[in-house]
Amino acid sequence: MAYFIDRRLNGKNKSAVNRQRFLRRYKSQIKQSVADAIRRRSVSDVESGESVTIPRDDISEPLFHQGSGGERHRVHPGNDHFVPHDHIERQQGGGAGGGSGDAGNGEGGEDDFVFQISKDEYLDLLFEDLALPNLRHNHYQQLTEFKTHRAGYTANGVPANISVVRSLQNSLARRSAMSAAKRRELHQLEQQLDALQHSEPVQPLETIRLRQEIETLRQRIARVPFIDSIDLRYKNYERRPEPSSQAVMFCLMDVSGSMDQATKEMAKRFYILLYLFLSRNYKNIEVVYIRHHTQAKEVDEQEFFYSQETGGTIVSSALKLMDEIIRARYDPAQWNIYAAQASDGDNWADDSPLCQQLLTTRLLPLVRYYCYIEITRRAHQTLWREYEGLSQRCDNFAMQHIREPQDIYPVFRELFARQVALR
């Protein structure tokens, strides 16, 4: 009876290793496809993966084949029209097909390659090369980052990570184990043959039998493969959580009457993207949500994204509340403080200079990074004009403009592109 042993470690995902190698090989094309996809779908729609399209030309492999010219020697079935060594003229152009459709005037081609990536793969590509700017590693407490480290060996992987020494050690151990009993038996038979050859009288038949058994055993030992897939070992790498400085992100959103529903929706999408980025890359980071119209209020996540409350516009109320919360709960000596403010830029005229003053004197000296996102299809408003001077003077202040939903992801990547961490 024959037994089949499945040594694959991937279970149902039998091509997981090949899949990861494919994702690494065509990373730039896949990232471009994901960037295009985020413009078509809702930012909050991350429960499913994404269909990724790669142009066929990008995955084509070099191919050696015979050219269209030259002289070839071939053997064809014989018939009554040709005899050996006849020269057959090559047909010019392609042959006619048997289909009934009309011919087109374009060149033939192949469809682009389309495949599905999972939710985790989608988010990994979405947030790759992004990080909190100016993160200072000065107080090891709650925030956890993940870094790649060597983690021993694994039985599957890519050829580039193969460990030759460990694989040969496993091969030697396996061959020794599989042939140990046969070698002991071979040693006994060789001793018997040696004793028989020195004994009287000579027994030729027994000598022949022992030599045949010895030869059979040697062949069986030689058939043990030198290397087997079960011997292969690959250097393993894993992402380990590493403690680093604790951080807090302040999310300030304008919900005044000047913010129409479409503008509020774009602001929510930006903050949802920010929330996904923080929760996926930083395990224990704290997030403070502040909504404001004429008055500012600290709210929870549910109320921040879904409350219908609205009113007039006094942006400074949110900045004052943020300043109060920082001084009450988040010591800048122990916390990395970040803020993201989203607004349509429409503010009470006398309040915009006060906002600039609050940022300059109270908030920017305390925060690692402050970003302002103005969401409007109109010309820039008073708040933008007041903030422009800050962006030129302060390295930890950034401004971006969102006009359409398609701008959300490019603006997000621009604001949170990975930088060298401060020490």
UniProtKB/Swiss-Prot annotation:
Which cystines does this chain contain? none
InterPro entries xrefs: UPF0229
Question: Region Disordered: start and end of each range?
Answer: 40-111
Return the Gly residues bias intervals.
Answer: 92-107
Compositionally biased intervals (Basic and acidic residues):
77-90
Q: Which family does it belong to?
A: Belongs to the UPF0229 family.
PANTHER family, A to Z: UPF0229 PROTEIN YEAH
Q: What is this protein called?
A: UPF0229 protein NT01EI_1636
